[in-house]
């Protein structure tokens, strides 16, 4: 990919019911999710998410019995671009992170699942350019478009260490912040590649579990909330306005994966 090193280049839902996930996210975000596995996925139940504009919104992986027994649970997970997965693994583990899954070489590139020093999981990936597209760029993230991931948020028990870790390995810059009160401290904005791509905050019991949460662009946050509740999801934080004027609702899907929707309040 021609994205800057450290970019968010893919998002994946691990779920116990891919068909139910397709119905839910179709209603809430408007995505189309394939009704059968990708035949090139090597026997795994892996399905692609398609946006209304024909672009890709990420993927859906059905959790198998073996994966569940090894600790997999419904969750969204991000892929960060690195130029060399082996080198990234060495650097991350030397800096207190962990390798959760060894490097795998797939038709789309090299991947490995890792965790930061506080335990938040994510993938590192060195992608293979699509045939005939040497300058292809991943556009699953956008700061303002519906049906893209618009915000990447990390809750961490050690905010200072997380800030330094992601700066060293992925070039995240957290130079601006806003106060969140005495219990949560500052909310640190993440800038990368000239864009404001997300934020970091202190993990606290009242703020829910730690790790990464991803916020999908919606055309109406109010409509997204209604769709979440009507389709078996659970709203974990009600509609609220955020800096810049957009509105956000946080939720879990029917299988328990955490996510949010951000956009105009709408009707």
PLM segments and residue spans:
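N-terminal beta-strand motif that seeds the catalytic metal site of vicinal oxygen chelate
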Residues: 1-22, 75-78, 125-163, 175, ...
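Vicinal oxygen chelate
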Residues: 2-4, 7-16, 47-50, 66-91, 93-146, 175-195, ...
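Ligand-binding pocket scaffold of soluble enzyme catalytic domains
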Residues: 12, 20-22, 29, 34-35, ...
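Generic "edge-of-domain/loop-turn" microfeature
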Residues: 18-20, 40, 54, 67, ...
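Conserved donor-binding loop and adjoining core beta-sheet/short helix segment
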Residues: 35-37, 52, 59-69
């Amino acid at each position: 990919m021609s994205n800057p090193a450290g970019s968010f280049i893919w998002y994946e839902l691990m779920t116990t019911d891919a068909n139910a996930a397709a119905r839910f996210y179709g209603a809430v975000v408007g995505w189309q999710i394939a009704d059968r596995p990708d035949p090139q996925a090597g026997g795994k139940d892996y399905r692609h998410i398609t946006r209304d504009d024909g672009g890709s919104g990420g993927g859906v992986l059905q959790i198998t019995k073996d994966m569940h027994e090894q600790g997999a649970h419904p969750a969204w997970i991000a892929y960060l671009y690195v130029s060399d997965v082996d080198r990234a693994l060495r650097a991350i583990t030397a800096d207190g992170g962990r390798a959760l899954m060894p490097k795998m070489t797939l038709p789309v590139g090299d991947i490995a699942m890792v965790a930061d020093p506080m335990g938040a999981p994510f993938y590192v990936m060195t992608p293979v350019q699509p045939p005939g597209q040497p300058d292809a760029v991943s556009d699953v993230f956008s700061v303002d478009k519906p049906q893209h991931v618009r915000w990447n948020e990390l809750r961490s028990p050690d905010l200072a260490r997380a800030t330094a870790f992601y700066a060293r390995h992925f070039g995240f810059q957290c130079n601006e912040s806003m106060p969140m009160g005495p219990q949560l401290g500052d909310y640190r904005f993440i800038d990368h590649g000239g864009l404001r791509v997300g934020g970091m905050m202190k993990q606290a019991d009242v703020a829910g579990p730690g790790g990464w949460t991803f916020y999908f662009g919606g055309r109406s946050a109010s409509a997204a909330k209604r769709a979440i509740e009507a389709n078996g999801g659970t709203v974990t934080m009600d509609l609220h306005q955020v800096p810049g004027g957009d509105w956000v609702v946080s939720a879990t899907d029917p299988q328990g994966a955490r996510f949010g929707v951000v956009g105009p309040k709408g009707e």
